[in-house]
Regions:
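N-terminal Rossmann-like NAD(P) cofactor-binding subdomain of oxidoreductases
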Residues: 1-198, 203-205, 301-304, 340, ...
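Short glycine-rich or small-residue beta-strand-to-loop segments that form or flank ligand, phosphate
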Residues: 2-5, 145, 244-246, 311-314
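Conserved active-site and cofactor/substrate-binding residues in soluble primary-metabolism enzymes
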Residues: 11, 78, 125, 152-156, ...
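Short secondary-structure transition/capping segments
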Residues: 12, 74-85, 145-148, 219-228, ...
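Predominant activation on well-ordered alpha-helical scaffold segments within soluble catalytic domains
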Residues: 17, 155-162, 211-215, 259, ...
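Short, well-ordered loop/turn and helix-capping segments at boundaries between secondary-structure elements
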Residues: 22, 220, 332-336
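C-terminal substrate-binding/catalytic lobe of Rossmann-fold NAD(P)-dependent oxidoreductases
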Residues: 27-67, 169-171, 175-176, 180-311
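C-terminal helical cap and adjacent loop that interface with cofactors, partners, or active-site loops
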Residues: 287-350
Length: 350
């Protein structure tokens, strides 16, 4: 299967290439970059030296469509939609890693992103790319939109709680900690080492755009409107997300019952792991132990005094939060084994 990657010079694009070069059933045919056109890929992504000998191509839609069976688009929000529309009209399968097709209501793009969607007719044809939510739709879809990294980490932890009507849906609080790679390769004053090192920095503490995705997807599960308050923080790691999801129980449930619910909900999911250890240091999910993998680790604790259930989830923002999910979606779309190209144990220590 011939694969193309549009916008492959960033962190997510590099991670996509890392996974694709080892995938047993695909061949990378074309890799594009506006800024790095005609440079060797391994000069921008030195870790890929010896694995890929391509140069970045300038964008050529005709060549891309004629030489690739499936295309990943990994360009900034607001720039992907025209590329995706052109490829879609040509019948090419697309996996988009921008936010341009995640939300189903065109009005939500005005609310969360501040711009009017130029192709609202495509929103209903796009599938939100979380296999744990939409596997059957992904199988049949021509266009899959990968989720936001913090959104998917939170969604996986909360979904079973709503499915089983365990929590109040008008008061969910999502607290996310994310590493510096989540900011991408474009530098600014806050991303320089002297300013970034050692921080625990709140950013967009209200109305973060991933809130829209979480409300949309949990609303589909609940079949009603969901209210989510989300506050992300930049922390002193390179890769990884830890999400602490504060939810409030409708009635007290014991720990054993809750574990059964989680395990039954995700018993057939290859990339969901449960962290539950009464002893030792590793009692709860920790992003340190998912780095380089497509796993999302899930755990919880119950605050009986306040009828509060704290659902915790950890992932690698470049893997389950981006490139790993993209490859998982590709495997489903093409009928491959879901773990093809993703059978990596996490790297440790990192």
């Amino acid at each position: 299967m011939e694969v193309g990657v549009v916008g492959a010079s960033g962190y997510v694009g590099g991670e996509l290439l890392r996974l694709l070069v080892s995938h047993p059933k695909v061949h990378i045919n074309m890799v594009t970059s506006r800024q790095k056109a005609r440079e060797y890929v391994h000069r921008i992504h030195p870790s890929l030296k010896g694995f890929i000998d391509l140069t970045f191509s300038p964008m050529d839609m005709e060549k891309l469509a004629n030489s690739c069976d499936i295309v990943f688009t990994s360009v900034p929000h607001g720039m992907a939609n025209k590329i995706v529309k052109d490829l879609y009209d040509r019948g090419i399968k697309i996996i988009d890693l921008s936010a341009d097709f995640r939300l189903k209501n065109p009005k939500d793009y005005i609310k969360w992103y501040g711009w009017e969607h130029p192709f609202p007719e495509l929103l209903s044809k796009s599938t939100y790319g979380v296999p744990e939510f939409h596997r059957d739709e992904i199988k049949k879809s021509q266009l899959v939109s990968c989720p936001g990294c913090m959104a998917v980490t939170s969604l996986i932890a909360i979904k079973p709680l709503i499915e089983h009507n365990l929590i109040e849906t008008d008061h969910i609080v999502v607290d996310s900690k994310i590493g510096s790679s989540g900011a991408g390769t474009k530098s600014n004053a806050g991303t320089h080492h002297a300013m970034r090192y050692g921080v625990i920095r709140p950013y967009k503490p209200v109305k973060h755009r991933h809130t829209g995705e979480i409300e949309q997807e949990l609303g589909l599960v609940a079949k009603k409107e969901i209210k989510v308050s989300m506050s992300p923080h930049a922390v002193n790691i390179v890769r990884g997300i830890l999400t602490t999801n504060h939810t409030f129980l409708k009635k007290i449930i014991n720990e054993l019952e809750l574990w059964k619910i989680y395990r039954n909900s995700y018993k057939n999911e290859p990339f969901i792991r449960f962290i539950h250890d009464k002893k030792g240091l590793y009692k709860f999910p920790d992003p340190k132990f998912v780095i380089g993998s497509n796993f999302c680790d899930v755990g919880f604790d119950i605050d009986d005094d306040n009828q509060r259930l704290v659902a915790l989830s950890a992932s690698d923002n470049l893997m389950k939060g981006a490139a790993g999910s993209a490859i998982q979606n590709m495997n489903i779309m093409l009928g491959y084994e879901e773990m093809d190209g993703l059978k990596y144990t996490p790297l440790t220590p990192v």
